[in-house]
Amino acid sequence: MDNAICMFYIVKEAPMISGAAYVVKALQEEQVDILFNYPGAATIDIMDELYKQDKVKVILPRHEQALAHAADGYARSTGKVGVCMVTSGPGATNLVTGIATAYSDSVPLVCITGQVDLGLMGNDAFQEVDTVGIVRNICKYAITVRDRKELGRILKEAFYIARTGRPGPVVVDIPKNIQKAMGSDEYPTEVNIRGYKPNTTVHVGQVKKACSIISKAKRPLFLLGGGVSISGANDLMMKLVEKTGIPVVTTLMGKGAIDSRHPLYLGNIGIHGGYAPNVALTDCDVMISIGTRFNDRITGKLSTFAQNCKIIHIDVDAASISKNIKVDIPIVADAKLAIEKLLEYIEPHDLGEWPAQLQQLKADRPVTQAGEEGLTPQIVIDYINNHYARPIVATDVGQNQLWTTQFLELKGQHQMLTSGGLGTMGYGFPAALGAQIGKPDKRVFAICGDGGVQMNIQEFATAMHYRLPVTLIILNNGFLGNVRQWQQLFYDKRYACTNLLMDESAIVTRDMIDNDKFEYVPDFVKLAEAYGAKAMRITKVEDIEKGFQLADTFKDGPTLLEFIIPTELNVLPMVPAGKSLSDMLLKDKK
């Protein structure tokens, strides 16, 4: 009998780890270095695994909404995906405003929410809400993990979806029993999602058509939105502007698409845009719009917008094209790829007096508060322009946001963080903290109003805890200023529910400021000092430098600089609701 040869094969199985440990491994595989987290029972197993490692630093803000805004600020300032985690129920619902804010402004976030056991879902369990049902319409994608085997695929897809195409937030809801379940530790290396294929090419034929139209234009204009900076196309955009000599206007989110000091840059357009930019938008014969959505803040009355021009619209999101404004040449593409092709095919031509006419108009009708006496937001913001090179500035929402976008000089991407789409009060301060964490060597400012800053003022504790040297600037006029401005101009000064002063019949005047008769709750200086921060109240122009010097020298935490300004100082120009851009108010109604 022949000798039998027996062969044995040893199959090495992948190590088995818990779902909680797998989540941490996924974060590490995706090169996540910062996780913004607020703990709870539904995520305690993941937190325990985070405790055992040192690759992912965990930041503990003091409220889930602020946590989302901090992750948002981190993402906008670094260009990376921001990652946050909260518990189930109220943890998830507190996150909702931050998710919607990021979705409106195309900010890539991965939001992990804890959830009750699968077997308890639908039974009104403690801290149970239908998280996916709540957020489905305010994020790119939301899913509850129902099988431990699917956890890797879902997390891999979450990061891919968040950062590709039009970026945005993705919500992954992980039940507690999935976190405890054992499974393979293998993490996927590829993504293949049926039905989700972001466009990565440019239709050259459409680009050539666009170039043909531009070559015949006598009054062409670039309208740049947030998509230019999101795609990292700022340097290429500058080359395109200089090659063509075409003037540039921007949306609020688009500011920084090119250097705002460039001679061809006219300023912001829209309902609080400058006179020259809005006139240019009305008078141009060809508009090249890149990375914009044409929302109502840009267009004013839709039926009167850009009636006499051809519109070329470039956007990565096909759903944004011809959604509000019918366009002549649609190009669905990433802004950077499209600009590269425009540079390849476009040929400059003589634009006559058009650029010079617009520059003269800008000089004749500047956006300025130069006629105001005493301390103004413009003077404060000009100090930043003149003393800091490429700082990061986060704004809140309201007059503070609009003044900042009017007067702040930007030199490129990742410099100004603001809630442009949703208009979320309480965004500015936590977003600045997230930016400081992401860019520790950068000078970071938050410019807020006295109303919005109180929505997340508790984040002073976070700033002190992590020694974040953010400078919080509060423009304090004693009111919810943006609404009050509308009440002044269109509601006969009936200041209903906007007065934040102790005396509800008072307004802040220059006389009150000069004579120190300003009564306000809280005392922001004492509040900041209670957290261990430095603070100073400033009422005179000559004290501005002293305030910023205080902020520059304190490195162990935040500094609060409170600037007292008159209540009835308004943001102008302004387009009234329902009016066209040509109906701008250039000065206050008497």
Task: Identify the role of each PLM range.
Residues I112, M121, F126-Q127, I271, ...:
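Thiamine diphosphate
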Residues C139-Y141, N192-R194, Q359-E373, V508-R510:
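Short glycine/proline- and acidic residue-enriched helix-loop micro-motifs
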Residues P167-V170, P348-L361, T368:
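Flexible, glycine/charged-enriched surface loops at secondary-structure junctions
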Residues A20-V23, Q28-D33, I46-L50, Q359-Q436:
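Active-site diphosphate/adenylate-binding microenvironment
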Residues T43, E64-H69, N400-L402, K540-I544:
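Short acidic loop-to-helix transition motifs that present clustered carboxylates
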Residues I10-H349, Y383, V470-L472, F490-C497, ...:
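N-terminal alpha/beta PP-like core and its mobile active-site loop of ThDP/TPP-dependent enzymes
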